[in-house]
Structures are given as C-alpha cells and as structure tokens.
Amino acid sequence: MKKKGFIIGGICLAVVAGILGYNHEAVRVVFHNVYSPSVKLDDSSKWNGGKAYEKLPYSEASENDYLDLYVPDSEKPMPLIILVHGGGFVYNDSQSRQAQLMYRYFRDHGYACASVNYRLAQEAAFPAGVEDVKSAIRFLRANAEKYGYDPERFAIWGESAGGYLSVICGASNDEEFNSVPFIGEDENHPVSSEVQMILDYYGCVEFGTMEDDYKELRIPRIVRWAASLWLQGAIKDTGYEDVESYWMRKDVKTLTEDEKN
C-alpha cells in the first residue's frame, strides 16, 4: 500500500508539473527519486560472496544512523568507497536504486563499500546530515581492522544531495561538524574523519544562485522547497550559500586531467 501511494503521488506530481509547463526532464528525475527506494535490483552475478553487513548502526543519534557495508574477499585490506545517497535531502535511503548501482559496481571491482544512511531534513535540518556522515566515516575508520579494509585509503562518493554532503565532509577538517559521536568513540578517541578522495556526482556546492537557476530551468517548486527545508529557510537568508565556507583542509586539490586518466 505504501509503495502504491508513492507511485500515485509521483504520477500526480508529474501530471501537475506537465500542466504547469515545468521542465519534463526535472519531473522525470523527481519521479525517479520518489520511486527508487521501492526498487530492488537483482543480485549481482559478479559478487564473490565476501561479507555484507546491512543496517549496521554507527551512531545513537537517530535510528536512521546506520550503514550497509560490503567487503569482498581479499588477502589484504582494500580501499573503502563511502557512498552517500541523494534525494533532495528529503528522500531515499542507503538502499536507493542509485546507491545499489554504485555499491555493486565498486564492490564487484574489488573495493569495500559502505552506503551511509543519514537523517533527512524532515527529521533534522542542516547540519545534522553532515554530522551523521562524518560520524559514519569515523566509525568506519575505527573499525577498519575488524571488518577488513584499509583505514588510510578512504574515498567518499555522493550523488545530488549526497554529492553536497560528500564535498562538505571531505573538505572540512576534523573540528568541523563533529558533534555526533559514533558508537564506540569513547574507546577510540580521537579518530579522524578525513578522506583521501572526494567524488561529487552532480551535487550542488553553491546555493547562492540556486533560486535563479531553478526558475530559469523551470524546476518544480517542490524541489526548490526541499533545499530550503534542509537549510531551515530561504536559501539566500541562511548564510550557508556555498561549500567554500567549510573548505578548511589546506591539502584539498582538484585532480588534473592526467590524474583523472
């Protein structure tokens, strides 16, 4: 029944948006995100078995603070890819369609993967989600030996809202957004939330022009509302207009074309 309700709601949203002349591609993306948490992909034939830990709690701040960890069989510790799902800060979870596609790809190519769930805007606004993800990173580093991956080779990847969270978490230092303790922090303190690579897949990093961009692209008002809900008010009035304010790590740099290749 819940799944049916989401589908009907998504169809209604698409119809209304079409009548009002909104960008049809934007409507498709919104509908896809509304529906995607209900999608369960077929098991991957490339997965070698390894070890899987689903809904592993990393913090006691919320029942939604958990992650799904996948560690392929390997003779030595492997790099860890930390995945942060999108959904406009108001929807999706660690098993969204996008998250499943990404962790399966990396997992099947020999990387350990952790798909992180975090508090959405309707439960707790900015910076709760950022603090949750950084808590998850510290939890993963503290438990690297237990689960079998390399604590010195962490990358964080996020799409859409998850891309925004990934950039802030990766570019800020350990003193920023560290108020959510991870489970076991008392026995492991201090643990760094630093990552060695940040991958942002179409995540917004500058909110200052977002309102104008949304209007120009005829993005549905409900999508514009999501970011405002996340920031607890109109974007231009919050003081959190871009990620640059939190670009604390001096060693962060953009990859050159040669390095990308």
Predicted regions located by residue number:
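N-terminal Sec-pathway targeting helices
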Residues: 1-16
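Alpha/beta-hydrolase superfamily serine-hydrolase fold, recognizing
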Residues: 15-261
